[in-house]
Structure formats: C-alpha cells, structure tokens
C-alpha cells in the first residue's frame, strides 16, 4: 500500500496513521499462529505430534536399513529427522545430488549447501510420506548396490 506523505486529514498524516496501524497490528506473533501453537498442548495436538514422530522414525528406519545394506557410513535418524551419509565413491555432494536425481529421481540436500565442510556428504529428510520414503530407499539400494 502506498500512501503519499503529503496526504492529511484533519491535520494528521494519513501515512503516519497507516504506519502506526500496521506496526500495531503486526507487532508480535499473529493470532492464528498463537492459536496454532496453543493447540499443540491439547490432547489432540499431542496425539498428532506423536503420530508424526512415529512416521518420521519409521521413515528413518527405512533409509538407515538401505544404507546399512549398502555399507554406507551415515549418522542421524535416531534422534533427528535427518540422515547424513557419506557420498559413495568419493563423489562430491552436488555430483551425488545430480546422480540420484537423474538415475532414480530421488532428492536430498547436498552437504556443500551447509558450507565447505559438508562437501562429500549428503542429507536425507525423513519428512516425506512413508510410501515415498520406502520407494526412495528401495531405489537407493537398487542403484548403489550394483
């Protein structure tokens, strides 16, 4: 919204009133976010959170089993929703990203995106659906187990 500085009503700057209104209305966390955050602490909210965590742990188990089968070093997945693996065959993290994308249409996050120390590592998320995660794990084993 553009309100010219020169625009006044009753000797008051409409621009200044608009800025005051917007900064007051948007000061702090919005009402809908506050209500959503409070819902976490209800019985239903707790049930849903625990169900989501159960799904994420199941997804992690599928990915970790695939990496175990392949003998690839990894960490995470047990107490975090991410699994970090070492890229196979000394591949760079972006090269591995491209390889997975083109060969089996599976994606993750190249470690180099987190800084130079991440080069040679790759991060998988467990936030996908169980079906997609199982399929990704199956495809990983099929591709890298050759």
Question: At which residue positions do the language-model features occur?
Answer:
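PLP-dependent class I/II
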Residues: 1-146
């Amino acid at each position: 919204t553009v309100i010219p500085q020169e625009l006044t009503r009753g000797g008051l700057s409409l621009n200044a009133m608009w800025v005051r209104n917007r900064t007051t209305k948007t000061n702090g966390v919005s009402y809908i976010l506050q209500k959503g955050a409070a819902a976490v602490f209800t019985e239903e909210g707790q049930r849903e959170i625990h169900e989501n965590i159960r799904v994420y742990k199941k997804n992690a188990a599928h990915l970790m089993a695939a990496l175990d089968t392949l003998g690839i070093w990894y960490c995470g997945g047990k107490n975090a929703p991410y699994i970090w693996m070492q890229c196979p065959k000394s591949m760079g993290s972006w090269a591995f990203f491209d390889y997975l994308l083109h060969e089996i249409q599976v994606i993750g996050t190249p470690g180099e995106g987190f800084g130079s120390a991440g080069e040679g590592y790759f991060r998988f998320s467990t936030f996908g659906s169980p079906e997609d995660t199982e399929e990704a794990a199956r495809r990983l084993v099929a591709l890298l187990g050759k």
